[in-house]
């Protein structure tokens, strides 16, 4: 059976086809713009986080933090530097930096050096382990300080003061983990002692801690990722 399409019908069919094509093109363009906008937003957010990590931020970006951000069991990375586990990290720094692997190793030896090999943080309590010996105390927030370093970038120390506990536990502890607002830490540098102001001047020794459930090789992978 042969069907004849009249001129008005042909005109209507052509109009519908053009309308459908326009809608498809418009949707495709909108999706392209949306994807491009998402990529731009993602890159901008990543860039902003990278700036903060490298020490470039505005004062009003800094927000108070609680011990909850560092809760958990942590291990010192110093033994891994001593036994050579971190040698690939030093080699990578030498490849991209201005010192030899040996020079970087000496720099990090001074920075990581500590006899506190493990720290456990739970609620307000912090326990410091030196081998089989431990010292435990409760801490409350004592604000934060923004520091400017020699090369022009900055860092934030989040400070906590002891309220009670063992005499061997430090009076003040200061966290630095490249974050400047509430965020769960994946590692941190810790400063401790009896003099709040004096600790702020300490920039050569910064014992560094990673989660206790990570192996040395996993810590190397984490460090190389940064």
Label each PLM-derived region with a short phrase.
Residues 2-6, 15-16, 22-100, 176, ...:
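Amphipathic/hydrophobic helical signal segments and adjacent flexible N-terminal regions
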Residues 10:
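Polyanion-binding surfaces on beta-sheet-dominated domains and ring/shell assemblies
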